[in-house]
C-alpha cells in the first residue's frame, strides 16, 4: 500500500510529489539529540526529511523498486561510530544511509565463491549480525553477515563463529 492522509487528518510531513512506498525512521543511537530524520523511497529515489526543515531532500536515484526492507546498525567512520540505516530489496540490492551526513552508498556484498550478485528481499538483525533472505535463485537460503560487520558476509574457516555465510533449509511442501 501507499501512504496517504486519512480524511480529517493533517500531514505529518511535507508532500513529496510521488507516492511513498517505504518510510523508515532513522534511529539515532550515537546522536540522540539530533532532530528526527525519516527516509522515504518514492519514484525510484531515496529521500530524507529532517523534522523542522522545509522539505524532502533527494539523496540518490535510479532504483527499480521503491519497496525496501530495512534495519538500523552502526559503522565506524574516521574512528567514530556512526548510525546507519541499511536497506535492501531483490531488484536493487543493498544500500546504506549514513547518519553523519545522510549520504546514500550502494553496497556490493561478497558472499563467497558460490554466490554472486545476491540481493536480499528482506533483512533482519539478530546477535549483531544482519540476516538476509529472499534472494533470487536462492529460495531456500538464509544468509548472515559477520558479527559487527554488516557488509562482510564471507566465512572465516579458522573461526567459523566470526564469519558470515549461508544456511540452506530446503523445503518441499511450502512450509
Model regions: which residues?
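Recognizes the extracellular SEMA beta-propeller fold with strongest preference
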Residues: 1-175
